[in-house]
From Swiss-Prot:
<dbReference type="InterPro" id="IPR032466">
    <property type="entry name" value="Metal_Hydrolase"/>
</dbReference>
<keyword id="KW-0119">Carbohydrate metabolism</keyword>
<keyword id="KW-0378">Hydrolase</keyword>
<comment type="function">
    <text>Catalyzes the hydrolysis of L-fucono-1,5-lactone to L-fuconate. Can also hydrolyze L-fucono-1,4-lactone, L-galactono-1,4-lactone D-arabinono-1,4-lactone and L-xylono-1,4-lactone.</text>
</comment>
<protein>
    <recommendedName>
        <fullName>L-fucono-1,5-lactonase</fullName>
        <ecNumber>3.1.1.120</ecNumber>
    </recommendedName>
</protein>
<dbReference type="InterPro" id="IPR052350">
    <property type="entry name" value="Metallo-dep_Lactonases"/>
</dbReference>
<dbReference type="GO" id="GO:0016787">
    <property type="term" value="F:hydrolase activity"/>
</dbReference>
<dbReference type="InterPro" id="IPR006680">
    <property type="entry name" value="Amidohydro-rel"/>
</dbReference>
<comment type="similarity">
    <text>Belongs to the metallo-dependent hydrolases superfamily.</text>
</comment>
<dbReference type="Pfam" id="PF04909">
    <property type="entry name" value="Amidohydro_2"/>
</dbReference>
Amino acid sequence: MTFRIDAHQHFWQMASRDGYWPPQTLDAIYRDFGPQDLEPLLARSGVQRTVVVQSLPTQEDTRYLLDVASRTSFVAAVVGWVDLKSTDAPADIASLARDPKFRGIRPMLQDLADDDWIDDPVLEPAIDAMLAHDLAFDALVTPRHLPALLAFARRYPRLRIVIDHAAKPPIASGRSEAWHVAMSELAAHPNVHCKLSGLWTEAGPHPDLLRVEPYVRAVCDWFGASRLIWGSDWPVSRLAGHFGDYGAWLAWCEQCCDRFLGPDARARVFGGNACHFYRIDRPSGDQHAQ
């Protein structure tokens, strides 16, 4: 059986979000989502493990996810949140890292007014703590953040960085020249990886798959079979209308990877690379984790 990891999914409880995204107008995702909702989708799609990623900029949300992960066998890793510019960041990171499933940190860069927030030496104590605890960095960015992310990646070449949702390219508008230039520059750095996730959502509620495909081909070309990591972005993926079907997104991505990287890349893109990036123990006999 093929070993698959969904390297990007979310859980949340609306009562604890205090008006934070999603708004009530997004009725497809304006409700609680937990392991009981995702487990049947994983079973039908042949996905064995997941990485749950924060969606609130609070440590309370991170602690909630760690608690859920401790009671959910299919959750292999948690990517949480820490205020990386706080003087308490190193201690907060050390505290969270005591949990064996805490494997990464994601500042919500897309929601910050300062495009260059990440390009700041003030982050150094926090990044040093991440390196000391062998943690990964998830970059939730849009194209406007990519120049600063490039400077950040150059400053910390030992830090494992993954670009969530391929930096949310402007698929709907098609104005992607700046995205192409910046992503190709980032891909030249071996510590930078890319998540094959969220692209149907970025294409709008009724995506034209022929318009999405060139973006998949681009990240396949840039990051190759060893630095591309598949994720569902569930339940946010439900915003893509009937294209938000979990199994349909997985199958389409597998077909694209077969075409652009070759069938032998599947084991890495859909499982092995996530194992390596997030330090997840792989099943015995799976030789494609790196």
